[in-house]
Amino acid sequence: MVVIQGKGGKADPRVIGKDEEHQKSIVKLSQIKKIMKDRTRMRISKDALVAVSACVMYLISEITDGAKNVASTDGKKKVMPKHINNAICNDTELHFVGHDWLIKNGGMKSYIAPGDFAVSSKKGSSRD
């Protein structure tokens, strides 16, 4: 007679906590899955969800870091929407990604393309 013994009871909370620390994220994978599935009408793998989550976390960290720097240069201790807008406009890569983002109470976008000054000076000199 062979008796098979299995682990009974609840799982050890110390072991579960260590595994979940690496997967913890601000953005839930289920939310990303719902958005991607609604837009693509395809099945989404877990690796794709983790990759998109990492990209979103990177963008959030870049925007918050830039907004913190803008707020500190203004002498403020509180990050406001205008600081986020200025951070996106001042960073070339973030501006390339988010040039059409509208941030409520963010003020006007103050990005001037490098070629804008050259074009305006040529127009003024051709009138003579």
Swiss-Prot record:
It is found in: Nucleus; Chromosome. Keywords: Chromosome, DNA-binding, Nucleosome core, Nucleus. One of its GO terms (cellular component) is nucleosome. Its main location: nucleus. Pfam families: CBFD_NFYB_HMF (PF00808). Disulfide bonds: none annotated. GO terms for molecular function: DNA binding; protein heterodimerization activity. Belongs to the histone H2A family. Core component of nucleosome. Nucleosomes wrap and compact DNA into chromatin, limiting DNA accessibility to the cellular machineries which require DNA as a template. Histones thereby play a central role in transcription regulation, DNA repair, DNA replication and chromosomal stability. DNA accessibility is regulated via a complex set of post-translational modifications of histones, also called histone code, and nucleosome remodeling. The nucleosome is a histone octamer containing two molecules each of H2A, H2B, H3 and H4 assembled in one H3-H4 heterotetramer and two H2A-H2B heterodimers. The octamer wraps approximately 147 bp of DNA. This is Histone H2A. The gene is HTA1.
